[in-house]
Amino acid sequence: MGEALNGLKRTMMCGEPREEHVGQKITLMGWVQRNRKLGGLDFIDLRDKTGIMQVVFGEEINAEAFEKAKGVRPEYCIAVTGEVVKRESVNENMPTGFVELKCQSLKILSESETPPIYIKENLDAAENIRLKYRYLDLRRPDMHRIFEIRSKTTKSIRDYLEKNDFLDVETPMLTKSTPEGARDYLVPSRNYPGMFYALPQSPQIFKQLLMVSGFDKYYQIVKCFRDEDLRANRQPEFTQVDMELSFVEQDDIMALNEGLIAHVFKEVAGVDVKLPIKRMTFKDAMEKYGSDKPDLRFGMEITNITEDVKDMDFVVFKSAIEAGGSVRALCLKGGAALGRKPLDKLGEFVKTYKAKGLAWIQLKEDGVKSSIAKFLTDDVTNSIIETMGAETGDAILIVADKESVVFQSLGALRLELAKQFELIKDKNEFNFTWITEFPLFEYSEEEERYTACHHPFTAPMEEDLDFLESAPGKVRSKAYDLVLNGEELGGGSIRIHDMELQQRMFKALGFTEEQAWERFGFLLQAFKFGPPPHGGLAFGLDRMIMFLAGTENIKDVIAFPKNQNAYCYLSEAPNIADEKQLTELGIGILPKQEKQEQE
């Protein structure tokens, strides 16, 4: 049984003692990193979230403490009191390495079994073990540093927004399911058998209702939930910095959030963000980088060479152009040195993005070498080289197909080449850009209808309104995303505040009037009562912390994350519900075989 504190107070953290504290009597509390014996003395490295302090036990220092220390093992939780003295053998690798504590009193507050993971910086244990024993994983000082950054970031965000007259308002966690986009997490209602709440994917409708309520400027740091197939750096529950403003236009929201980003990155990471942040249309981003989340830390833009090759007698290029597609290319500096095998691997790589293959031209010292040499004339070759701005030693990598495939495959290839050839020179660079003028709709082949690129409440650009019914694919939106180093940091839009336009939007999405009112009637009803022009934005807080903390794994910035299958190794959630609970909720679970037969 562990000893009680009985009034004993900690007077200093383990990482704090310095030479100026020599001669002082202090009390430290923490966990044993290691216990070693040397020359008749015991040396314990005592750790807390601030660092490690060496504590010395000896017969002549205090016999009782020395005897107790012999049984102390790693991860025991202890309290020590003693005098700070200079170390005979200095450890310059530790901030406390010039001093040590001569222990005059030891309390063993609690014992520990042998831990399944070793508590140290840069732990290389298997992820499932780290997540199962997350409370041990979180003892590591580098994990504490991340959550100190997270706490500092949320405070910085709140300070900035409240200084700009934003009001923190909580919105419901139990909401109505509106099946559009990702799947909802459903919560059965005991009071209304057979009916369900949904956990919010975002506070979208409620924050718009707050604008109708006259709140003017709202914000919330809020949990959101999406039951989707998890990709890298996605979690089923995540934290969003959510905001909405009335009587504003797009430029107002972007300027305010540029100020927020500059404030937070300076205060938390000491980074000066250059303002104003550059802007790029969705169309330009796709054509130049093959992505609406371009990584601008390196060049290598996609170049359109359709005009250069349109008269070539090469069926792949010809058929792509005739079908309304294009021929585009990347210029890889130094790529002429690549052998056939790595070029073939790049060809296989683009095929995973539905490209039919990769044509290439290498500009070697002794002439041009190409996978399509027999179709190239000197004039066409020279025209391509000039358009690409290529030089001797370079390689030109070409894809021909419908534009969606060309952009996707070359965009992915661009990022792959950046990894392989280390094209990002400054890994600590923060390169921001706004992406604007997104399409309002995208066509779903699976559902055979148009779906909203962002959500159904995004306002279309006025100049494109005439296309809303006749050519939805041509309509651009008043939506904007903030991209950092190839990752979407946040996104938002100006909202529709006109009931007639909102109904036109629902109709374009394939909703009948009855379906629109059934799903979103409470918003449409509110729009009868003078809604103001409004818009907003939401940042992914978890992703922002990843950048500020310098980690590439989203699980590092969430205290108790799920794995890629939305499973919690620590609590073993989800679990089987008690039969009594299911009965109260009016729920029956189909046997697996019966479920499969019904499907």
Swiss-Prot record:
The record's GO molecular-function terms, alphabetically, read: aspartate-tRNA ligase activity; ATP binding; catalytic activity, acting on a protein; nucleic acid binding; transferase activity
What segment(s) does the record annotate as region Aspartate?
A: 204-207
Q: Does the keyword Aminoacyl-tRNA synthetase apply?
A: yes
Which InterPro entries did the record assign?
Aa-tRNA-synt_II, aa-tRNA-synth_II, aa-tRNA-synth_II/BPL/LPL, Asp-tRNA-ligase_1, Asp-tRNA-ligase_1_N, Asp/Asn-tRNA-synth_IIb, AspRS_core, GAD-like_sf
- Per the UniProt entry, the signal peptide is none
One Pfam family from the UniProt entry?
Answer: tRNA-synt_2
Q: Which UniProt keywords apply?
A: Aminoacyl-tRNA synthetase, ATP-binding, Cytoplasm, Ligase, Nucleotide-binding, Protein biosynthesis
Q: Which residues bind ATP?
A: 226-228, 235, 488, 540-543
Residues recorded as binding L-aspartate, renumbered to this chain, are 180, 226, 454, 495
Q: What is its EC number?
A: 6.1.1.12
Gene Ontology CC: cytoplasm
Gene3D superfamilies linked:
Bira Bifunctional Protein, Domain 2, GAD-like domain, Nucleic acid-binding proteins
- Any one biological process term the GO annotation gives: aspartyl-tRNA aminoacylation
Subcellular location per UniProt equals: Cytoplasm
Is Cytoplasm among the key words of this record?
yes
| Enzymatic reactions | tRNA(Asp) + L-aspartate + ATP = L-aspartyl-tRNA(Asp) + AMP + diphosphate
Leading EC class: ligase
Quaternary structure, from the entry? Homodimer.
What HAMAP family does the annotation carry?
Asp_tRNA_synth_type1
Q: Which family does it belong to?
A: Belongs to the class-II aminoacyl-tRNA synthetase family. Type 1 subfamily.
What the protein does?
Catalyzes the attachment of L-aspartate to tRNA(Asp) in a two-step reaction: L-aspartate is first activated by ATP to form Asp-AMP and then transferred to the acceptor end of tRNA(Asp).
Q: What is this protein called?
A: Aspartate--tRNA ligase
Supply the source organism for this entry: Clostridium botulinum (strain Alaska E43 / Type E3)
